Amino acid sequence: MRAITNSGWIEVVTGSMFSGKTEELLRRLRRAEIAGQSIAVFKPAVDDRYGETTVGSHVGRQWEAAVVPNEGEDIWNIKHELSKKKQNHRTTTQCRSGDGTNNPGGVIPSNDDSVDVVAIDEANFFSTELVSVCESLANDGYRVVVSGTDQTYRGEPFEPLPQLMAVAEYVDKLQAICTQCGEPATRNQRLVDDSPAHIDDPTIVVGADETYEARCRNCHILRHE
């Protein structure tokens, strides 16, 4: 359980592919939903593996999400979307005349921010501008839950996850099982035509089990020739 506070915070769920990152994100969202908390989910425009407006896990669970650009200042659309939700859900109460209030017949706005939890999946597909967005959201009092892999297929740091892990209050790094030897897997093995990818291949290629495997350090392979 996370500590109950009066301020926002950032949670990061990371690890290799097939380690259950999105599944853990969805589990936390389900718990928040059961508790009556309101939730807003966002995903990068580049990820459409489970539908354009759906966050999905490899085991089939899904959650509706808003799609936002993954580059530059457009990432701040996350905050703009929350502002619209806040405005749309802000309610007013018409006070009845003679009800004992000091403002008979007046209008009292309620301070309903409408969203308690902000979730962002596949954070590794966003630019580093996402770090500033998440910090701003936490400073505004939101619980921010972010998931994404922290390593490229080369085994190198995959921004912005390392920076998010540095500023987050809570970090959980999950492991998968190596498809080759059964040891704990921490690496993303990219396969091209069933062969290990070349070290000079592009960093971002969106795929599922047909293009990636989870592997341990010893079984992870990069082609150099």
Swiss-Prot record:
UniProt enzyme class: transferase
GO biological process: DNA biosynthetic process; thymidine metabolic process
Main localisation: cytoplasm
InterPro entries per record: P-loop_NTPase (IPR027417), Thymidine_kinase (IPR001267), Thymidine_kinase_CS (IPR020633)
Any Gene Ontology CC annotation: cytoplasm
Keywords annotated in UniProt: ATP-binding, Cytoplasm, DNA synthesis, Kinase, Metal-binding, Nucleotide-binding, Transferase, Zinc
Catalysis: reaction(s): thymidine + ATP = dTMP + ADP + H(+)
Coiled-coil region(s): none
Molecular function in Gene Ontology: ATP binding; thymidine kinase activity; zinc ion binding
UniProt-annotated catalytic positions: E122
Membrane-crossing residue ranges in chain numbering: none
Subcellular locations according to the entry: Cytoplasm
Residues involved in Zn(2+) binding: C178, C181, C216, C219
Source species, domain of life: Archaea
Compositional bias annotation for Polar residues: 90-104
Its EC number(s): 2.7.1.21
Subunit structure and binding partners: Homotetramer.
Family as reported in the entry's similarity comment: Belongs to the thymidine kinase family.
Protein name: Thymidine kinase
Organism name: Haloquadratum walsbyi (strain DSM 16790 / HBSQ001)
Gene assigned in the entry: tdk
